Each structure stands twice: as structure tokens, then as C-alpha cells.
């Protein structure tokens, strides 16, 4: 069961109707303190955009950061029915069951632990990198690949399924 505040933050980001949010709104949506947000801006982890209303965050920038904070499975679950409207078909999760030698499972657990992430998160990131590296070859056989790899940098707007 997902914590209510995590669900609320994810939904606030992915279902946000405006293209930009203030620094304070962004910090609240990500669950960060003001000092964490200032550090992230200073370190280039997240970039501000200058708008006619001043410096703001593009909601897509927050969506990218959300993907770093939560797995796609968590995001999809938090979005509930709206997931099919927000997540492109190639991004929606599917269950994959596999069997690996014990040493590979142990290695995955150690490496994920070293990176302070779950095995699912680590594998999700590794497969994204693999698909991106093999994009040219895979694009011809996986119709939604380019859109899936580009997401969420493309506009986050509800789509008909």
C-alpha cells in the first residue's frame, strides 16, 4: 500500500494542469525541504525556467525528477485510472518473471543496495540505458520505443487510450 502523501505528490506532478510551478510548489510536490531544493538547483539536479512570471519549474522537469524518486510501478499505481491517460503505452509497466542464477540475484541485491535503490529501480534504469543504447536497432521492431524513451520530456497531457 502506498503512503497517502506519496500518492498525493505523484498525482500533483503528473496530473498538474499548468506547464510551470513555483519553486515552493515544486519542493512540496517532490517532498523536499527548501534547503534540499536550493541544493538541487545549485548542483544542477533540477533546472529552473524563466517565464513571464519569474523563475519556475517546467512540470516535465519535475516528472523526470519523480522518475528518479519513484519507480514507474509506483507512479502508475499512484495515478490509478489516469495512468492510461498520462503514461504512453510503451511506458506502462508489465510484469516479467524470470529465473536467474543465485549469484546474479545476490549481485543485483548488492549493487542496488550500494546505489541505495531497489532492485526494480536499478533494473528499470539499466534497461532504459540498454534500450537507449540500442535505440536505432530496436526502433524498427518496437513501435512505441522512441516515445517511451523520450517521456516525460514531451508534454504531459492526458491522451486517449
Predicted segments, located by residue:
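Polyanion-binding surface elements
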Residues: 6-36
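DNA major-groove recognition helix of helix-turn-helix
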Residues: 41, 52, 61, 66, ...
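A short, Lys/Arg-enriched interface patch at domain edges and termini
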Residues: 60-93
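Short, charged, intrinsically disordered terminal tails
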Residues: 133-161
